[in-house]
């Protein structure tokens, strides 16, 4: 009888003869090609990820800058409209007959219907470490600071006027119609 060494050798020899070395080499080559492709793809994805994170940071900064600008503009416009309402109220108290045909609610409006949500201002305040915005607008409106401001101080109280000129009876009738 054959020895156990010879039986195992025969079995291994037959098992190895069943495997085609060309097929094994082709599989190894295909695996190397796939590995190269995966490494290149991985490198491209890493580059894309890095580029995307840089762009996201840039766009986030721009978005925050534009958001701050819009919030500042809204705050400035609110201040301007509040001043206009205050001036209208003062003029209405000083010259009630000039404002008699205008309903009181139309020139003494409350704050806007859509105020800035606190979450936006909180987000802006917490996301930046700035010294704050500088409000250069004056607290009171004066003729010397506001170009185009019409000085109405020379008009006598109780006389309706448009553009600094007193109206005649004929003109009043045409403006009331």
Swiss-Prot record:
Magnesium is among the record's keywords: no
Record field: compositional bias (Polar residues): 125-145
Primary location class: membrane
Modified residues (N-acetylmethionine): 1
Keyword Translocase: no
Tissue: Widely expressed.
Domain of life: Eukaryota
Keywords: Acetylation, Lysosome, Membrane
Effect of a null allele: Show defects in the lysosome-related organelles (LRO) biogenesis, mimicking mildly the human Hermansky-Pudlak syndrome (HPS).
Compartment(s): Lysosome membrane
Chain intervals for the UniProt region annotation (Disordered): 100-177
InterPro entries cross-referenced by the UniProt entry: KXD1-like (IPR039843), KxDL_dom (IPR019371)
Cellular component annotations (GO), alphabetically ordered: BORC complex; cytoplasmic side of lysosomal membrane
GO biological process, one term: regulation of endosome size
Membership in a protein family: Belongs to the KXD1 family.
Subunit structure: Component of the BLOC-one-related complex (BORC) which is composed of BLOC1S1, BLOC1S2, BORCS5, BORCS6, BORCS7, BORCS8, KXD1 and SNAPIN. Associates with the BLOC-1 complex. Interacts with BLOC1S1. Interacts with DTNBP1/BLOC1S7 (via coiled-coil domain).
Function field: As part of the BORC complex may play a role in lysosomes movement and localization at the cell periphery. Associated with the cytosolic face of lysosomes, the BORC complex may recruit ARL8B and couple lysosomes to microtubule plus-end-directed kinesin motor. May also be involved in the biogenesis of lysosome-related organelles such as melanosomes.
The protein's name: KxDL motif-containing protein 1
Annotated gene: Kxd1
